[in-house]
Amino acid sequence: MTRSLKKNPFVANHLLKKINKLNTKEEKEIIITWSRASTIIPIMVGHTIAIHNGKEHLPIYITDRMVGHKLGEFAPTLNFRGHAKSDNRSRR
């Protein structure tokens, strides 16, 4: 279910402050965050944000095509290693 257009997109305050500070200094630096629920807004374009996936922080470069999506969409949390092999030889 999408967020109402009457409301603004959710962006964590600490993340917004860090991005605004880097934009005023015109610096590029990796921003570490745990806020997977934050929406990507246009002022984030061009920054690299390290998003937590539950184990480590994955650095993601933000492009203009990502605007409107959530940060968590780009850092998968599950690591599928395939289905278990059938072990018929050990049963014999």
UniProtKB/Swiss-Prot annotation:
SUPFAM superfamilies linked: Ribosomal protein S19 (SSF54570)
Keywords noted in UniProt: Chloroplast, Plastid, Ribonucleoprotein, Ribosomal protein, RNA-binding, rRNA-binding
PROSITE patterns: RIBOSOMAL_S19 (PS00323)
Gene Ontology MF term list: rRNA binding; structural constituent of ribosome
Listed InterPro entries: Ribosomal_uS19 (IPR002222), Ribosomal_uS19_bac-type (IPR005732), Ribosomal_uS19_CS (IPR020934), Ribosomal_uS19_SF (IPR023575)
A GO CC term assigned to this protein in UniProt: small ribosomal subunit
Record-level GO BP terms: translation
Bridged cysteine pairs (disulfide): none
Pfam families referenced in this protein's UniProt entry, alphabetically: Ribosomal_S19 (PF00203)
Annotated compartments: Plastid, Chloroplast
Domain of life per record: Eukaryota
HAMAP family, per the entry: Ribosomal_uS19 (MF_00531)
Family recorded in the similarity comment: Belongs to the universal ribosomal protein uS19 family.
Record PANTHER family: RIBOSOMAL PROTEIN S19P FAMILY MEMBER, SMALL RIBOSOMAL SUBUNIT PROTEIN US19M
Free-text function comment from the UniProt entry: Protein S19 forms a complex with S13 that binds strongly to the 16S ribosomal RNA.
Protein name per UniProt: Small ribosomal subunit protein uS19c
Phylogenetic classification of the source organism: Eukaryota, Viridiplantae, Streptophyta, Embryophyta, Tracheophyta
